[in-house]
Amino acid sequence: MKRGHGVGEHRIARLMRVEGIRAKTVKKWRATTDLDHPWPVATNTLNRQFQIEQPNRVWAGDMTYVWTTEGWLYLAVVLDLYSRTVIGWAMGHRLTVDLAERAFTMALTHRKPMAGLLHHSDRGSQYAARRYQRLLGEHGITSSMSRTGNCWDNACVESFFGTLKRELVYHRRYTTRNEATQDIFEYIEVFDNRRRRHSTLGYYSPAEFEARTAVA
């Protein structure tokens, strides 16, 4: 059997950069929707009507995951579908109702919506839980949920997660959850909300779109 030469990791990385070779990132998968719960689920009131005419009419929430050497980091977000702005987010090492609530509470703090808002999500345990639904009810918010196993019913948030991973996460190898948290925070608040141009918004960023339509 032929044996190769011993080569250090840093030298391999340098040679790969010179040759324009990139290592393929292994994409770990983990389920985030727990359908095995006792709580009732809402009907799909949104019904894929993603083009919203005013802010704070429809919010959409969902969760995803990012792998680090320490283990999984979970991300919950709330988007205003009018401008695709991430108005609430939370990260943690457990996939819990509390994570969803923290993202939603941030959204409430930023926006202070009037009663009548529609909140769309999947029908997992975090969003169907009594305490989360009670929180929606306390603010006069109606719940809408995707059909079973149909990610297209929440396509706007799924699209955000896909873009986040393609543009950021799949190019990183996070050692700690704190490292990933800081990176994702900067992506959301510095880049995506303020600078990233969206084709659905006429190639304005969410912040530009909201500022432009507020003046119009």
Stretches with model-predicted labels:
Residues M1-A216:
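Charged DNA-binding/catalytic regions of mobile-element recombinases
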